[in-house]
């Protein structure tokens, strides 16, 4: 179920504070965050945010198409390497 419109978008306060500081200083340094639950707002466009995926921070450049999505959608947490190969099929 989507979030109620009267509540507005959710962005962690510490992340929003870092975004405004980066905009004021025109910093190109990535903003590190563990807040995968935060929504991408128009203020973040053009910034690089390093989103934690459980092991490392994945740098994500914010674009206009990403507005309305959550940060965690762009930092994959699972690493699928394929199914184990069948030994009998390899010998043939």
Curated annotation (Swiss-Prot):
One of its GO terms (cellular component) is cytoplasm. InterPro entries: Ribosomal_uS19, Ribosomal_uS19_bac-type, Ribosomal_uS19_CS, Ribosomal_uS19_SF. Keywords: Ribonucleoprotein, Ribosomal protein, RNA-binding, rRNA-binding. GO terms for molecular function: rRNA binding; structural constituent of ribosome. GO terms for biological process: ribosomal small subunit assembly; translation. The keyword Ribonucleoprotein applies. Protein S19 forms a complex with S13 that binds strongly to the 16S ribosomal RNA. Belongs to the universal ribosomal protein uS19 family. This is Small ribosomal subunit protein uS19. It comes from Francisella philomiragia subsp. philomiragia (strain ATCC 25017 / CCUG 19701 / FSC 153 / O#319-036).
